[in-house]
């Protein structure tokens, strides 16, 4: 039950916000872009992808011609059957990549989702551990007189604010990953069309690499949450004989430090992946 003490309530509310954001992250990472927010964003992105496909196909021809001009010294090179066949195969593959780009991206997404679910199940918890206020801390706070509790109010206000801000920063990173996935999906045909020409194909390659990096960010975020849950599963050790303010300050300090570690890891997930994949 909720305590009727304002200080305890404030701390418990902040922790509740944190816990709800953590479980929301857990939920978001197992959600596919088609299910996110009822799928309305996804359907718009698919429509945009379809419209951009026309531009992609026009660019495909352009990159193909540029590629032919750049790679063939003269027209006689193009007339060689093996050279012509190579060019034709490249064009056909590039056309296929644009037409079935969405399916390709979803297949990659499914592979990474599988990895994320495997990480979750092998870690052995379906949801991250809840952070709660220790009972002895509640007792200490509730036994304070009016004047003793004035500095406590200040401490909990600062602590509560910190915890709330950290939980929002963390959830924003996860939403940011989703929005990146949508943007990649919508604009995919343009970078994919560069596969038509040999000089321009690096753009397409780096597009696919960056897309995989965005997908794998999810796995890093899950790992960060798992490590945090295990790291913070033992509540901060507080000296029960110390003054109430000191106890609360020590508790909040250690808690916020643990949370900062997690938020830092979540925010750096894209950098970690880029370093891992050498992007």
For the regions a language model picked out, list residue spans one by one.
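Alpha-helical transmembrane segments
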Residues: 192-209, 241, 272-276
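Short amphipathic alpha-helical coupling elements at transmembrane boundaries
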Residues: 24-27, 83-90, 110, 117, ...
